[in-house]
Amino acid sequence: MPPKKAQTRRIVSLDSLFGHTLLNITGEPVTPTKIAIFQLIRTLFHAHFGVGAVPSLKPFDKDEKTRVFTVLYGLIIMKSEISYDDFRCIVRILNDGLGRSIYYRFVTSMEKLAHGEDQIEMLFEDAFYTAKRPNHEKVLKREDSWLDELTFMNSNSFLYIWIKRVMMQYTRTSQNGTFEIAEKFQKWIISGTLEIISHPILSGINRALPTEIDCSIRARHWCAAQLRLVQLCPTKAMSYFQILDWCDTIHRRHHDVVDVHLLRAAIFVQLKNSSDAVKSLKQFFDMSMLEITENSKHALETLKLMSPSQVALRFGPILQGRVHRIFGERQIASALFAESIQQSQVNVDDMCNRIANMEVTINSIYMSGPLLQRLSGETFAAGKKEEESVENERRVQQNSVHAAVDLNVPTLRSLQKNFREDYELHAFLVSMCKFLLCIQDMMDGKFFKHNSTADYVSVGFHRLRLLLDMNNKGFVLQAFANAIMTSGLIQSGMYHQAKRVAETMIVSNCDAPNSPILETESHAVAGVNLVYSLAAVGDYEKAQKTIDILKNRFPENINWMAARHVDICSKIVNFERNFLLNKYSECSRHLAGLETSAPLEFVLRKSLLLAATGKLAEAVLLLGTYECGDVRGSMRIHMQMATIHTAYGQFETAEIQIQEAGKVAVNAHFLDANLLVVRRVGSLMLGRFMAREAYQVLHALSAKIEHFGSFIEKAIYHVSMARCLRLMHKDPRVHLKQCKAQIIGNKWPAMEKLLLTELTILHHSGGLYPDEQKEMKAKERFGKIEADFPGPCTWMFI
C-alpha cells in the first residue's frame, strides 16, 4: 500500500511579514512640517527631562503635559502643510503657557538646520526611550532616584507610534531623497509671508512678530543693520518711533539680545533725549556684565558657563561721555573719560586707555558749532575752576597717548574677537590720534609752519590705507579728513580748491546696492563748505539751491547733528546776502538762533549790523566783551573793530586794533591772514586821505587778492585802488572794470552805486576823462538802483 502523501497547509509566513521591517512597515511621508514637529518634540523633551546628564530644573507637571500633547496631537492630525510662520505662532502660544525658553530653543535649532550648521537627524537619545539619565562624575545623583526617571511619552501612545513611523521612513530614504528633503525644508523656512493663524488671542505675547525679529538671531542682525543705518544713512532706516517699538518688543521677547539697548541709546540721541540715552547705555552695560567662559576646563569644574566681565567698567564711561559731549555737557564728559582712563590702568587695558585719551582730546577740540573754532572764553573760565591737580594729571595722561601712537600693534589686551579686527582698530586709533594733533595745529594757526605735523599725519593715513577696513573705520576717518580739509581751505581763502574737494567728496558719495548714499556729519560739513565756497565767489543762486538740497538730505527731525551745520550755513549765507542788499530787517531775522549754535559768528555779524545802523557804542561793546579763545576768531574781532572805528573816523583806535590783528596774523598759518589785515590798513589810510600811501600798501596785495580773496574783498580792493588812482590823478578804469566784474548781477547794488559815483566823478566836466554821455548814463543807472535798493554803501565796515 503506497504511503499517504504528506498534507501541507498554507499558513502566513511571519518571516515574510516581519523579516524586513524597513521594507514592509507603513512609513509616514517626511515633510518640512513633520521635521518641525520632530524638532518641537525634541525641544519639549529637553525642557522636561534635561540634556544628557544635566537634569531639568522644572519638569512638566500634569497640566503642562496635557497642554503639550494637545498641541502635538493637533499638529500631527492636520491633513495639510502649514507655513513656517504659522508654526512659529503655534510654538509661541505654547511658550506662553509653559515658559522655559521653548520658543527660543526651537527657533534656534530650526535656524541652524536651515543654514546648514546642523544636519537633519530624525533620532532621539536613549533617555527618550529609557527615561533614565546617564551618570556623570560632575553631576551629583539625586537622593530620590525616582526623580531621575521622568517618562515623557508612553510607548503605546499614538504619538509614539507616529514618531517611529517617521523615523523609519527617513531611515530608509535614499541619499538623494535626504538631499531633496533638506532642500525642501530650507525653502519652507525662508519662503512665504506671515499668515496669521486663526486664534482668538493675537495680542501681547501671542502677537505674531515680524520676520526680522521673530528670533534672537534675526533680532541681532536687525539691530546691527538699523544701528549702522542710523549712524551712516538715517533716512534709509525705519522711523525712530517704530524702531523704539520694535526694540521694546525685542526686550520683552528676547532677553538675550542686549544690543537692543545700544540701538535705543542711538535713537534717543537722534531724538535729543539725553537722559533716556544714558539710561539705555546703563542697561546695555548692566546686561553685558556677564560673558561666556572661554576656559572649558574651568567651566566643567565649576559647572558655570558665564563669568563676570569688567569690560563695562572700562568702556561704559566712554560711551556715556560721548553722549554728554554731543549735548554740550563737556565737564561731565571729561570726568567720565577720566574714570575710564583710571579703570583701564587698573585693569591694564592698553586699548581702552588709548580710546579714552583720544576722547579727552576730542572733547577739548571738537565743537558742536562750526569746525576748527576753539571754545569761547566763558567755557574756558568754567573749566579753570577745576582743581589744578586734576588738570595736571589729565595733561600727563593726554601726553601719554601722544607718545604711544607710534606703536605698531596693541601690547596687552585685545578688544576684538580676532587679530585682524584688533589690528584694524589699533591702526584706526593711531591714525585718529595723529589726525587730532593735526586739527589742534590747524586751530592754533600753525599747521603750515615748518614742522613734522603733516608728515606725522600722512604716516597715519598710509597705515590706514593698508587695511581691509572690515568695519569702515578707514572710510569714516577719510570722510572726516576731507571735511576738515575743506574747512581748512576755506579758512585760508582757498575757495576754489575747497569747492573742488567738496564736490569730489559729494560726487563720490553715490548709491550702491549694498551701500546707500551716506548722510554722516562729515558729508554735511562738506556740503556746507561747498555752499561757503560758492557764496565766497558770489554765486548765491547756486549756493541757495545747494542749501535746499542739503536741507532735504539732512532733515532736522532725523539727523539733527548734521542739520545743525546746514542751519548755521543757511543763516550766515543769507545774512551776508541780505546785508549786501541793505535789507537789515532780514539780517536780524537770520541772526535768530545763531547765538547758541555759533556764538562767534553771531557776535561778528550782530556788531556789523549794529554799526551799519548807527549803533557804534553797542557794536564796540559787544565785540569788546566777547572772550574768544579761537586764533582766527581773535583776528577777525580785531579787524571788525578796526573797520568800525575807521568808518566812524576814529583812526587812532582803529590803528591799535589793526596792530593787534597783525600780531595774530604774523604768527598764524592762514594764507589769507596777511591779505585781510593789510587790505584794512589800506582802507584806514584811504579814510585818512593818504592816497599815495594807501596805494603802495594795496598794490603789494595784487597777487594775493586773486588767489585768496572773496568776491567782496576783491570788489573793495579794486574800488579802493581806483579811488587811490583817481586821487593821484591816474587812470583808475582798469580797477573799476574789475570791480564791476565782481559785483555783476545785483550781487552788491550798494557797491555798484559807489562804482557809478566814481564813474560820474571820473567823467564829470572837471574829471580826468570828461564825457557827458557816460556821466548821464552813470547817473541814470544810479537812480534805477537807488529806487530798487535804497541805502548807502557800507563797504568801510567790511
Swiss-Prot record:
The record's note on what follows loss of this gene reads:
Double RNAi-mediated knockdown and/or mutagenesis with gfi-3 results in increased embryonic lethality and the production of one-cell arrested embryos.
Give the GO cellular component terms, alphabetically. Answer: anaphase-promoting complex
| Keywords, sorted A to Z | Cell cycle, Cell division, Coiled coil, Developmental protein, Meiosis, Mitosis, Ubl conjugation pathway
Q: Which GO terms describe its biological process?
A: anaphase-promoting complex-dependent catabolic process; cell division; meiotic cell cycle; positive regulation of mitotic metaphase/anaphase transition; protein K11-linked ubiquitination; regulation of meiotic cell cycle; regulation of mitotic cell cycle
Which domain of life does this protein belong to?
Eukaryota
User: Is Coiled coil included in the keywords of this UniProt record?
Assistant: yes
- UniProt tissue specificity: Expressed in head neurons, vulval precursor cells and in mature sperm stored in the spermatheca.
Parts forming coiled coils: 339-359
Q: Which InterPro entries match?
A: Apc5
Q: In which pathway does it act?
A: Protein modification; protein ubiquitination
PANTHER family registered for this protein in UniProt: ANAPHASE-PROMOTING COMPLEX SUBUNIT 5 (PTHR12830), SUPPRESSOR OF SPINDLE CHECKPOINT DEFECT 1 (PTHR12830:SF10)
Q: What does this protein do?
A: Probable component of the anaphase promoting complex/cyclosome (APC/C), a cell cycle-regulated E3 ubiquitin ligase that controls progression through mitosis and the G1 phase of the cell cycle. The APC/C complex acts by mediating ubiquitination and subsequent degradation of target proteins. Required for the metaphase to anaphase transition in meiosis. Plays a role in the segregation of DNA and centrioles during meiosis in male germ cells.
> What subunit structure does UniProt give?
The APC/C complex is probably composed of at least 12 subunits: apc-2, apc-10, apc-11, cdc-26, emb-1, emb-27, emb-30, mat-1, mat-2, mat-3, such-1 and gfi-3.
The entry assigns this protein to a family as follows: Belongs to the APC5 family.
Protein name, please? Suppressor of spindle checkpoint defect 1
Q: Which organism is it from?
A: Caenorhabditis elegans
Whichever gene encodes this chain, its name is such-1
